[in-house]
């Protein structure tokens, strides 16, 4: 026999002996052992027992282990566990069975205090387990777990304290105090000995686990081993409620009750197997009739019916009563019906901040992510991994979204992302690419997509929330996806060509700024003549490369490269920002100057022109990017960086996104097509409000994990909500936030969140705020589809607006309604030919809400107001203009906001559009926050002194200054949004003047002159002033102020804009458009 074979036999023999010894010890009848023993007092806590305890990090919830593992952390290090027997309950019986004493034991560990109830027989069973363990630990069994445990307790004393031997029936009433003291001393001594304190029998006796003493999970609640029945989940379209004995099984689980949720764990692996959130439908029932189980306990909420089995009816009653008492004490906010039917309570003293456009929003998200220590939650309708959150890009890829997430994941932060899983035939957002890209960055990044359309039968509705949550303490809520095309600032640039030039020693920065466009244009004309030949182009590049290295005369170099021609030629080969980023990126593509660019990045300096007018063509100097200057060994390189790279430069009405797996390749020609500016609103909340946002995300995540089999593995963990009790402990705070009252709102249903009753609290809040507004409302929204007829449209936002105006008219009150929406829906289509069918369908329902048909707002007003409705309500859009390649161009600014401001004291910001999809709750899932001011500033309203809210008024003034062109002119008085002077002489007048000028110079569409398709064809064939008379056009455009334009009510008013029969859009249910 070989040595290897002999070793194999010996190993096998040892394993057999170990198994036999283990069985022997397990079956040892320890009732024969004496309970008496030498009492030992020992405190094994390291260092001083009174030393400050160390908190168990919240992230440990993702690293739970089997309950019998020897190295799991349960207790706070350096902190003793103190026990006190408070009382004894004596249960008498009329039968011959002896009376039973029930001891109430209060335990304290750091900040945590809890009680357990035990009979004397439980003490005896516990003592036998420890004796068994004491004997077992002496046997050198060759297993990894046993060896580890032996090594850990090698130097520890093993003498156990004594347990009273006499039977409880033998002691008299007056001896109960002594028995209590004996049991208390016994526990105290056991808990001072780590060898026994950390043993799984001890933790089970004390009702503690790995999740008991985590600070952010709140106070320690009830825990214990139970039997639970499978099933009971409310999964749409699937009948698996667990009724009927044929379709369920019983499993042993460790139940944990916290202040706002219950969970149970698998004892063998320590994995969290389910989380049940406390909500307004939380109920506990006991008895066979309610549970279909002997000694059963039933726990209901909006998402599940959970059936537990106890040892006796009394045990079931105790569990039910104890859970209910604990939740009533610590989680009462979650049990109540809240305002507007919301799942979330109203919270006072919440730090909140608003954002107009994505620049500041993205920057604060980037900074908050950088400060994350435990978790990052993200959910979006669309997410583009390669977008830059800080622009211009002067630090390489540091602030690129995927790079931030990877960096934080490497630091140990857990990142959970939920994406809307689109119907690929209808949408091209390619969420599968996003998931694949993010998941391969790091194991700490987990991505789910939902819904599965076939299995869930959900084809028409979408997850539309846009949320970023940091450590469940800071939550960004609004309408801005972390996706292409969303980043914008108050400039709303139309062009983003980018350029880099060299400033010679005798040339000033100011002269270069003034002459940059002209010189670049003249150079581009020369370049075009040789763009079809490879050799001359490459030769000029090599020559330029030599000039950059200091070879040759500097006067021959006026521009980095012939970027434009090569840009068009090489778009399809571009797969990284280094290939198409800017003029300097061309050299990266041709391996000529990558080291130079990286070397000078730290020395970049940003400049802006010393004076910029908000009017006319003088704005175009800011349209191509921010100017930067770089000192190098060959002189100063000066130019304008790009803000939108690759797919981020977009105009989705002109062309929808394609090839998203090539993020840095342009898909439209930025030298001939202006981008579509993006106007949006976001917000951030802290503390308890952020906890509520996280709770919604957690509910959706856990529901998706249950619903989709691929996510049931341990690699996709259940998420746990942090306690509201610790919400005030902010580790990170977004600068610039103010204190206010806040409440979270949502649209959610069975398909989106797994809840029994749908929620439409956003709809309820909108109608309530409008109906109860006293002076004005200001609305920005991507859609305006309302005015219920209970046939096609059901939300009542439009009706509330009309009724509030009628009330103001009847009472002789001055009241204003400001509505800003996109001039065209955001669907691909050529408006010069009438637009696509989808675009026309949305136009139909927008016009139906505003002015066409008996249900429209204007038709509801005219019977009483006639034409006086114009004194109450204004409909506007946004538009801007610029110069692109020597040509005057204009484009609408796409309003994507979901904003309502009322009376300078109430704001609703979220992801919900004004349409049935967003408002009714049963359709798209949405999230919003209503903020009501508690801090005020002196102001004016309707000509009278008024205390305006800091949050609401600040946001309203920022929006007004932006759209009216007053950001750089604070002298204009826009404090009073109700006065005739502001409403008529500033707001209405500016919108009308701007619209008239744009129509005169560009003959813009949509246009009030075009009532049908025949007129449309004639309209687009007429010459436009911008091409016929450049000087006159420029003179007219100098009169433009801001971005505000009147909305054209009569565009295609004689056409039926609904999809015609035979088109694919006509097959789509009407609910898709509304």
From Swiss-Prot:
Pfam families in the cross-refs: PH, PLDc, PLDc_2, PX
Membrane topology: Lipid-anchor
Record's subcellular location: Cytoplasm, Perinuclear region; Endoplasmic reticulum membrane; Golgi apparatus membrane; Late endosome membrane
PH domain residues: 219-328
EC number: 3.1.4.4
Modified residues (Phosphoserine): 499, 561, 629
Consequence of changing residue 240 to A: Abolishes palmitoylation and weakens membrane association
Any Gene Ontology CC annotation: endocytic vesicle
Catalytic activity line of the entry: a 1,2-diacyl-sn-glycero-3-phosphocholine + H2O = a 1,2-diacyl-sn-glycero-3-phosphate + choline + H(+); ethanol + a 1,2-diacyl-sn-glycero-3-phosphocholine = 1,2-diacyl-sn-glycero-3-phosphoethanol + choline; 1,2-dihexadecanoyl-sn-glycero-3-phosphocholine + H2O = 1,2-dihexadecanoyl-sn-glycero-3-phosphate + choline + H(+)
Region (Catalytic): 463-928
Keywords per UniProt: Cytoplasm, Endoplasmic reticulum, Endosome, Golgi apparatus, Hydrolase, Lipid degradation, Lipid metabolism, Lipoprotein, Membrane, Palmitate, Phosphoprotein, Repeat
Lipid attachment in record (S-palmitoyl cysteine): 240-241
Any one GO BP annotation for this protein: regulation of synaptic vesicle cycle
Domain PX: 81-212
Location of the PLD phosphodiesterase domain: 459-486, 891-918
Molecular function GO terms recorded: phosphatidylinositol binding; phospholipase D activity
Activity modulation comment: Stimulated by phosphatidylinositol 4,5-bisphosphate and phosphatidylinositol 3,4,5-trisphosphate, activated by the phosphokinase C-alpha, by the ADP-ribosylation factor-1 (ARF-1), and to a lesser extent by GTP-binding proteins: RHO A, RAC-1 and CDC42. Inhibited by oleate.
Record bears the keyword Cytoplasm: yes
InterPro entries in the cross-refs: PH-like_dom_sf, PH_domain, PLD-like_dom, PLipase_D/transphosphatidylase, PLipase_D_euk, PLipase_D_fam, PX_dom, PX_dom_sf
Phenotypic consequence of residue 241 to A: Abolishes palmitoylation and weakens membrane association
Main function: Function as phospholipase selective for phosphatidylcholine. Implicated as a critical step in numerous cellular pathways, including signal transduction, membrane trafficking, and the regulation of mitosis. May be involved in the regulation of perinuclear intravesicular membrane traffic.
Assembly information from the UniProt record: Interacts with PIP5K1B.
Family, per entry: Belongs to the phospholipase D family.
Name assigned to this protein: Phospholipase D1
Provenance organism: Rattus norvegicus
